[in-house]
């Protein structure tokens, strides 16, 4: 934890070979994973572990994440993840992140919106249901609350592939893990596109939780000024909408 404030959490992660893609660059899902792990550690440091939350039937549900990338990390790099709560607005909590390399250069920054939920009823809980006080950190800010992803209605989408939620994708709530959605988005692009384009970020809104056995039709747009839009849908529901931020 940061020595200057108990409200700012810092945690180090080493990039392993299994965290990288065929180009030896860190996967987008790896960044989402270490951000999630750092956020869990930050809350645990305040006296509320994930285990105790699960016993109480509570959990955190990410709603929207907006990540900007300067570059993807390389194998064996040591990364410092900084994360802090910016407090809540009604039932919604905002959490920011910055990721630095060993030289202190920022690789990525992100804004996110979360909700505290009753795991059994899948209902959003009021902040007062949290048995600890999560004070906001006010010394830094990545930005305002991220907007919900809106795919332009006139933008044509085509099915890239279909994905079925299985054992390897599940989290401890038996839903598809948040970080895995980044893999679903990245898999919508052909290798030729990854050779030609540079990833500069991800903007994603999680609409419905995907359960074991559910099939997701992953739809994508062509390249736009913003990047490639991706939607996961199936069974008459939309699971997520996202924009892979890309440039030539």
What are these regions (language model features)?
Residues 1-62, 109-111, 118-200:
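Hot-dog-fold acyl-thioester-processing enzymes
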Residues 2-10, 66-151, 206, 210-212, ...:
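HotDog/MaoC-like acyl-thioester-processing domains
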Residues 17-19, 69-71, 167, 203-208:
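Short, well-ordered turn and helix-capping elements at secondary-structure junctions
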């Amino acid at each position: 934890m940061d020595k200057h404030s108990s409200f700012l959490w810092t945690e180090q992660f080493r990039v392993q070979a299994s965290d990288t893609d065929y180009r030896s660059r860190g996967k987008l899902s790896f960044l989402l994973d270490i951000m999630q792990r750092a956020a869990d550690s930050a809350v645990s440091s305040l006296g509320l572990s994930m285990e105790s939350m699960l016993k109480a039937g509570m959990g955190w549900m990410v709603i929207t994440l907006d990540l900007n990338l300067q570059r993807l990390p390389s194998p064996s790099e040591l990364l410092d993840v900084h994360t802090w709560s910016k407090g809540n607005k009604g039932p919604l909590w905002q959490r920011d992140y910055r990721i630095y390399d060993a030289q202190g250069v920022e690789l990525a920054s992100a804004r996110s919106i979360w909700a505290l939920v009753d795991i059994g009823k899948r209902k959003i809980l009021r902040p007062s249901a949290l048995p600890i006080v999560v004070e906001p950190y006010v010394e830094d800010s990545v930005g305002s609350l991220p907007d919900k992803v809106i795919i332009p209605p006139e933008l044509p989408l085509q099915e890239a592939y279909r994905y079925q939620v299985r054992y390897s994708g599940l989290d401890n709530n038996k839903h598809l893990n948040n970080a895995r959605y980044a893999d679903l988005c990245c898999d919508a692009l052909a290798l030729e596109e990854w050779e030609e384009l540079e990833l500069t970020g991800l903007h994603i809104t999680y609409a419905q939780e995907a359960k074991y056995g559910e099939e997701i039709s992953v739809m994508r747009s062509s390249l736009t000024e913003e990047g490639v839009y991706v939607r996961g849908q199936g069974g008459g529901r939309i699971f997520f909408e996202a924009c892979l931020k890309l440039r030539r």
